[in-house]
Regions:
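Glycan-recognition patch characteristic of GH18 chitinases/ENGases
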Residues: 27-139
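Short, acidic/polar
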Residues: 40-54, 129-144, 205-215, 353-366
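Conserved, mostly hydrophobic/aromatic
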Residues: 60, 153, 224, 263, ...
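Substrate-binding surface in catalytic domains of secreted glycosidases
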Residues: 70-84, 159-307
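Glycan-binding loop/region signatures in secreted carbohydrate-active enzymes
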Residues: 110-120, 267-364, 393-396
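Beta-strand-rich domain onsets/edges
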Residues: 398-432, 497-527
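Glycine-centered loop-to-beta-strand initiation motif
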Residues: 454-469, 552-561
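Enriched for extracellular/lumenal, surface-exposed ectodomains of secreted and cell-surface proteins
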Residues: 472-493, 566-586
Length: 595
C-alpha cells in the first residue's frame, strides 16, 4: 500500500484503557447468524434462551415498547415484570456483548371505546411534518437515554389494519419518515432496523406488502427482518413455506444489500380445529378459548413432540414446505349451558417448524450471503432447533482476525506534548499469522456518545500493517479496525488511550533587580479561555513560596506579576492541571537571578 502522510487533529473525551489483547482461537467459532425477539411477557423463557446461545448471537431485540402517540412510547416491560427491573436484563445482555436494538410496535390505533383498532392513525401522523418530527425525536430520546444500539420498527398495522387502498399513500409517508429517522439515528452512531411482512418482485404479479418500500429505504436502513411466517392463519397450512420465504429473500437481496437482510423464523406452531362432532362444553379446557372449526391455537415449538405423543400422533416432515405436520383428535368433556354433562370431539391439524426446517432456512444465509435469521421468539424453540442452527453456523464460520497496535508506549503512559508528530500502526493477520493484505482499514476515535468514528481510511499493506501519521490534538481513545468479509470477521485492535499535554510558552527575564515589580506573560496552546494556570516558585534557600494562579483569556494568554524582595535564585515552573481533554502539563523549569 502506498502510504499517505496526513496530520490529523482529534478531540475526544478520555475513556479507560482496555488492557486485554485480542487473541486467536484454535478453531473458528460459529458465525453469529442468530437474532431474535425477547418479549416483555415471556422473560422467564426468552431471556435464558438468548443468554445461553451467545456463540450464535450478536444482537437481540427486546420486544418492550409501543408507540402510543407522537410524543409517547409506552414501556410494556415494567408493568409485566414488577419484581424484575429492566436494568437487570439489559445488564445481562450488555455483559454478553450483544447489541441491543429494541422493537417498537404501533400502539396508536387502539380505540378505547370499542377496543378495536382504528385504521390509518399512524399513517396520518406520518403525513404531518410536525408530528413526524415529534415521533423521530421521541424515538431518539428513547435510544439515547437508554444507551441502546439502535431501534427496530415493527409497524404491522400498515399491513393488517389499514385498508389496501391506503398502501400507496402510506408508502410515501413511510419513506419520508424512514429518511428522517435514519438521518437522526445515524448522526448519533445508532442503527435503524425495520421488521416487515414479505414483499415480492412486482414482475411476478405478487407484490406482497409493498407499502414498506424496500427499494426506496434500502440505503436508509441498516437491517431488514422479513417476517417469513404467518403464511397460514385462518386455515390449516404451513407457518412459512420455504419457497415462499425464498421468493421474499430473492427479491429483498435484489434491492437491498444482502448483508442487511435477516429472514424471520417462527419458534411457534399452530393447531387448527378442522371439524367438531358432538356438543362442546361451555368452558373448554386447556389453552382453547373456543372449540369450533377454523379456530387455531398457538403453541411453542418445544411442545410439539409432547403434544403429538399425548395423542398418539406421528409428525411427518413435508419436503415441499419444509415443515412438520400431524393430525389428532381431542375429546372435551364438561358441562353444557343447561348444566347437563356433554362432550365433543375435535379433529385438529398441526403445523410447525422443527430442527430440519431451521437447518434449511439457516442454509439460506450461505446461499444468499444474508446477515442472519431472526427468531420469533427466543425461548419457544426446541433445543434441537438451535443445535441445527449451530451446525450450519459452524459450517460457514468466518476466519478470526488477530489485531494488534504497535506504537510508542509513551502515548498511553507519560503522554506526548501537543504538536508532537507521531504515527500509529496496526497489524492484522489470520490466526496462522498470514498477513491480511489490501483490507479496507480505518483509524477510529471514541466519541462522547460512545460511538466509534473513522478519522482516517486506507488499506492494509502487503505485510498486513496499516500505518497512519497523526498529530494528536487532545486526549483520545483510538483503535484500528479492518472491514469484515463473508470469509473473514471484522478485526479491531485493543483501544489505546492517547494522553496529550498542553504547550506552555513563557519568557521570564534571566535576571532582575531585587524589589522590582515585573510582569511575565505567556500562552497556553491550544488557545482557550478559562484554562487554569499555576506558577510554582522555589527560592534559592529551597523554601517553597506560595504558588500563584490565574486563568487564560480567549487567546490562551496569561500573565503573572512578580516581586522578588531579596537577592538569590528563584526557580519557576508554569503548569496547567489535568482535565478531560489534557493531562497535567508543565513548562520547563526556569531560574531567574535576583540581584
Amino acid at each position: 500500500m502506498k502510504k499517505r502522510h496526513i496530520y490529523l487533529t482529534v478531540f475526544a473525551t478520555v475513556f479507560s484503557l482496555i488492557v486485554s489483547s485480542f487473541t486467536a482461537k484454535a478453531a473458528n467459532p460459529p458465525r453469529k447468524i442468530l437474532s431474535g425477539w425477547i418479549p416483555y411477557y415471556s422473560m422467564k423463557t426468552s431471556l435464558p434462551s438468548a443468554m445461553s446461545n451467545a456463540d450464535l448471537i450478536s444482537q437481540v431485540s427486546p420486544f418492550w415498547y409501543t408507540l402510543k402517540n407522537k410524543n409517547t412510547i409506552t414501556d410494556l416491560y415494567t408493568p409485566a415484570n414488577p419484581s424484575f427491573p429492566m436494568a437487570g436484563p439489559l445488564s445481562q445482555l450488555q455483559s454478553a456483548g450483544y447489541k441491543i436494538i429494541p422493537t417498537i410496535t404501533d400502539g396508536t390505533n387502539v380505540n378505547l371505546t370499542t377496543g378495536k383498532p382504528t385504521p390509518l392513525i399512524l399513517s396520518n401522523l406520518l403525513a404531518d411534518p410536525a408530528s413526524r418530527a415529534s415521533i423521530v425525536s421521541t424515538i431518539i430520546n428513547l435510544v439515547m437515554s437508554n444507551k441502546f444500539d439502535g431501534i427496530d420498527l415493527d409497524f404491522e398495522d400498515f399491513a393488517y389494519v389499514d385498508p389496501i387502498s391506503s398502501w400507496p399513500t402510506t408508502q410515501v409517508r413511510w419513506v419520508q419518515f424512514i429518511q428522517e429517522l435514519s438521518t437522526a439515528l445515524h448522526a448519533q452512531g445508532k442503527l435503524l432496523s425495520i421488521t416487515t411482512p414479505p414483499s415480492f418482485d412486482p414482475a411476478t404479479g405478487k407484490k406482497g406488502y409493498y407499502q414498506y418500500a424496500w427499494p426506496q429505504v434500502a440505503s436508509m436502513i441498516d437491517q431488514l427482518h422479513i417476517m417469513a411466517y404467518d403464511f397460514s392463519t385462518t386455515s390449516p397450512g404451513p407457518i412459512g413455506p420455504l419457497d415462499w420465504a425464498t421468493r421474499a429473500i430473492t427479491y429483498a437481496v435484489s434491492v437491498i444489500p444482502a448483508s442487511k437482510v435477516y429472514v424471520g423464523i417462527p419458534g411457534y406452531g399452530r393447531d387448527w380445529v378442522t371439524s367438531v362432532s358432538g356438543v362442546c362444553p361451555t368452558l373448554p379446557v386447556n389453552y382453547e378459548k373456543t372449540v369450533a372449526k377454523g379456530v387455531s391455537a398457538v403453541f411453542a415449538m418445544h411442545d410439539a413432540t409432547t403434544l403429538a405423543a399425548a395423542y398418539g400422533a406421528t409428525p411427518t416432515f413435508n419436503p415441499q414446505y419444509a415443515e412438520s405436520t400431524f393430525t389428532y383428535q381431542k375429546t372435551y368433556n364438561g358441562t353444557a349451558a343447561n348444566g347437563s354433562l356433554t362432550s365433543c370431539t375435535a379433529s385438529r391439524t398441526v403445523w410447525y417448524q422443527d430442527q430440519q426446517s431451521f437447518t434449511l432456512r439457516a442454509n439460506l444465509i450461505n446461499t444468499y450471503r444474508l446477515a442472519g435469521i431472526s427468531e420469533w421468539t427466543f425461548g419457544m424453540e426446541d433445543p434441537l432447533a438451535f443445535t441445527a442452527i449451530r451446525n450450519v453456523a459452524v459450517s460457514i464460520a468466518p476466519d478470526q482476525v488477530v489485531a494488534s497496535l504497535n506504537n510508542d508506549a509513551t502515548l498511553s503512559t507519560t503522554g506526548i506534548t501537543l504538536g508532537t508528530p507521531t504515527s500509529i500502526t496496526g497489524t492484522f493477520t489470520l490466526p496462522d499469522k498470514t498477513p491480511i493484505a489490501g483490507a479496507p482499514a480505518h483509524l477510529q476515535v471514541l466519541g462522547v456518545n460512545g460511538a466509534w468514528t473513522n478519522i482516517f481510511d486506507g488499506a492494509t499493506a502487503a505485510d498486513g500493517t496499516f500505518t497512519v501519521p497523526v498529530l494528536w490534538g487532545s486526549n483520545v481513545t483510538a483503535r484500528m479496525i479492518i472491514d469484515g468479509t463473508w470469509t473473514r470477521l471484522e478485526g479491531d485492535t485493543t483501544p489505546l488511550v492517547v494522553k496529550v499535554a498542553r504547550v506552555i510558552a513563557w519568557s521570564p527575564p534571566a535576571s532582575i533587580k531585587a524589589g522590582l515589580t515585573y510582569t511575565v506573560a505567556g500562552q497556553v496552546q491550544p488557545k482557550a479561555a478559562g484554562v487554569t494556570v499555576n506558577l510554582g516558585i522555589v527560592s534559592s534557600t529551597k523554601s517553597s513560596i506560595a504558588p500563584m494562579t490565574t486563568t487564560t483569556d480567549a487567546n490562551g494568554n496569561f500573565s503573572f506579576t512578580l516581586n522578588n524582595a531579596t537577592p538569590g535564585f528563584y526557580t519557576y515552573q508554569v503548569s496547567t492541571p489535568e482535565d478531560a481533554s489534557y493531562i497535567l502539563s508543565n513548562s520547563p523549569f526556569v531560574t531567574v537571578v535576583t540581584r
